[in-house]
């Protein structure tokens, strides 16, 4: 139990295999490296210690600890239901498809070029949540004016709405990043276009002056 606490502490101590990084082992690793013949001549203890000198592969999935917190390798936004929070907005705008005479509800993907209403729907839902937040705030003021002991339920409702707004904004960030990148590229293109126009203008002026000589 104490070992786990040490590993997960804010500033964990050096790993136990740090003791194998001696001058002798460092020299032996430089001489042997990954040469199987030279490694075969080493003792079993030396080969076990030299394994720690080989750089490990980067992890593809799972989680890791850093400064006392657990972080996932793949940075994914968890669902509100996974955090035990009620979701107050529609996840995506459903699309009705007709197949073999039957209708099915299909959720468009954010990467789908035909699902332009996906992010528009997020904007609409965020506006609804903001209006709901203002309404609940006014109701909270009314409750405090009548009976201040009944504020806890309304305050919890406001907390859930605020978390939903925050989560919805985080879902919108990929679209915001893409639009910001498009704006940056457009600014760079406009800047290069102006530079080309200026260069062409200077070239025309030089040619006209040379023609007058």
Curated annotation (Swiss-Prot):
Function according to Swiss-Prot or TrEMBL: Component of the Mediator complex, a coactivator involved in the regulated transcription of nearly all RNA polymerase II-dependent genes. Mediator functions as a bridge to convey information from gene-specific regulatory proteins to the basal RNA polymerase II transcription machinery. Mediator is recruited to promoters by direct interactions with regulatory proteins and serves as a scaffold for the assembly of a functional preinitiation complex with RNA polymerase II and the general transcription factors.
Pfam family, one: Med7
Subunit composition and interactions: Component of the Mediator complex.
The protein's name: Mediator of RNA polymerase II transcription subunit 7
Stretches for region Disordered: 96-120
InterPro entries (alphabetical): Med7/Med21-like (IPR037212), Mediatior_Med7 (IPR009244), Mediatior_Med7_sf (IPR044888)
GO cellular component: core mediator complex; mediator complex
GO biological process: regulation of transcription by RNA polymerase II
Keyword terms: Activator, Nucleus, Transcription, Transcription regulation
Annotated localization: Nucleus
